[in-house]
Amino acid sequence: RTAEALLFELVKAKELGYNMIREHVKVEPAGWYYHCDREGILVWQDMPSGDMGNKWEMHTYNGGTDKNRTQESKDNFSKEWKEIMDLCMPSPSVVVWVPFNEAWGQFDTERIVNWTMEYDPSRLVNPASGGNHRPCGHMLDLHNYPGPAMKLFDPQRVNVLGEYGGIGLPMEGHLWWNKRNWGYVQFKTPEEVTAEYEKYAKSLIKYVRLGFSGAVYTQTTD
């Protein structure tokens, strides 16, 4: 991905009406965050998931199980998470830290979240996007596919839908594997995709009225 391609994707997202990008389980070059600063696009920055999968209890309120990782694994996580934060801190576009995604390797949630909040008290912390919920951090984040749905609500925190959508459209000449295409639902024409996307977007309105604060469409590329 060239610098021009990175900027093109950001500008296109802005033209499509998005005001935030969740940098999902990866880290971009420093120039990408610079472009977000200039274009006025907010960023949620994830920690890339590590270790083995954990017991997933997304719909359990504040009772999720933490994984027992080795001390070496814990130390590596803490070191690399700090390095990611140090890289991104100078960028005002970065407004939310996301230490865990779903329950992938999720461990010592309250300790990690509290450390993150202390290390950077200027930003919000989303403990585990769609993960096992613990009574810490600033946000309660759920995932639901394909259409939007929120099955929990926390009156003490910001409530968000961290992932929904997953609309797939196989395009000849752009497939890396023609036997399988990405997507929770798949369509054959751009018009069908647009209609499905608009249906999901309109259904989000009712959640705004109920007090929910944000939603992340997953995803603009495969």
Question: Where do the protein language model's features map onto the residues?
Answer:
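Substrate-binding/catalytic cleft of secreted carbohydrate-active enzymes
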Residues: 20-222
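N-terminal carbohydrate-binding accessory modules
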Residues: 1-13, 34
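A conserved hydrophobic secondary-structure block that centers on an alpha-helix together
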Residues: 10, 15-22
